[in-house]
Design a protein with these regions (language model features):
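Peripheral interaction segments used for macromolecular assembly
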Residues: 1-189
Length: 189
C-alpha cells in the first residue's frame, strides 16, 4: 500500500506470482479500484478493474521494481507503507511496518509494527491506530512518524492476527491507551 502525506491510501501493491518464482512481479493499482468485503481473513478483496484501455493513464496498473527499497516505485509525495521504518519525531527508530489493517470503510484503521531490534529480547509485534501515524517530508520523500512515547509502546498489548485487535492510540498526557480497532484480523493488504 502507498499513502500520501495526509495518510490517505493511494495505491495497493499486488505481488503477481509466476511459476516457481520465475516471472514474479509487483504491480501497483489505484486504491479506488479495490472493493473490501467485511468479514476478515476468509473474505475476498476484489479488484474491480475495467479494461486497461478504458482507464485514464494515471489509473493504469504500473510495474514496480523488485528492490529492497521501501520507496522503489512510489510516486512523488507518496510512501510505500509495508516494510517502511517508523520513527519518532526526534528521529529515533520505533520499528518496521509489517501490516496495515483495513476497516469496513476501506480505510486504514491500524498499522502493525515490529518493534525492538533483531536480537532484542523485548522484540514484539503491536498494533497502533492509524491516527498515531503521520507522514513528514525528508530528503525528497516521506517518512513515517509515530506519535507514541516509550511508555505507550511498552504498555501496548501484543498483536495477534487471530485475536481481537487492540491498537494503541496517542493519549493526552502521555498515558498509555489501547483502543479496539474496527479492522478485522487478517485484513492484510
Amino acid at each position: 500500500m502507498t499513502a500520501d502525506a495526509n495518510g490517505a491510501p493511494r495505491e495497493m501493491l499486488v505481488n503477481l506470482q509466476g511459476f516457481m518464482g520465475v516471472g514474479d512481479r509487483k504491480v501497483s493499482f489505484p486504491w479506488k479500484l479495490f472493493r473490501f468485503t467485511p468479514g476478515g481473513r476468509h473474505e475476498p478483496v476484489i479488484l474491480d478493474m475495467p479494461a486497461t484501455a478504458q482507464l485514464q493513464p494515471a489509473d493504469r496498473p504500473k510495474a514496480v521494481p523488485l528492490t529492497g527499497s521501501t520507496q522503489a516505485g512510489a510516486e512523488p509525495g507518496q510512501m510505500r507503507i509495508i516494510d517502511a521504518d517508523v520513527e519518532r519525531p526526534n528521529g529515533a527508530k520505533v520499528g518496521r511496518v509489517v501490516d496495515v489493517l483495513i476497516g469496513r470503510d476501506a480505510q486504514p484503521q491500524a498499522v502493525v509494527l515490529d518493534v525492538g531490534g533483531l536480537v532484542d529480547p523485548d522484540r514484539r509485534t503491536i498494533a497502533a491506530n492509524w491516527s498515531a501515524l503521520r507522514f513528514a517530508p525528508k530528503d525528497k520523500s516521506l517518512r513515517a512518524l509515530l506519535d507514541l512515547n516509550d511508555a505507550q509502546l511498552k504498555a501496548s498489548p501484543p498483536y495477534a492476527g487471530d485475536k481481537p485487535i487492540l491498537a494503541v492510540s496517542p493519549a493526552a498526557g502521555g498515558a498509555p491507551a489501547a483502543a479496539p480497532a474496527t479492522a478485522r484480523a487478517g485484513a492484510k493488504r
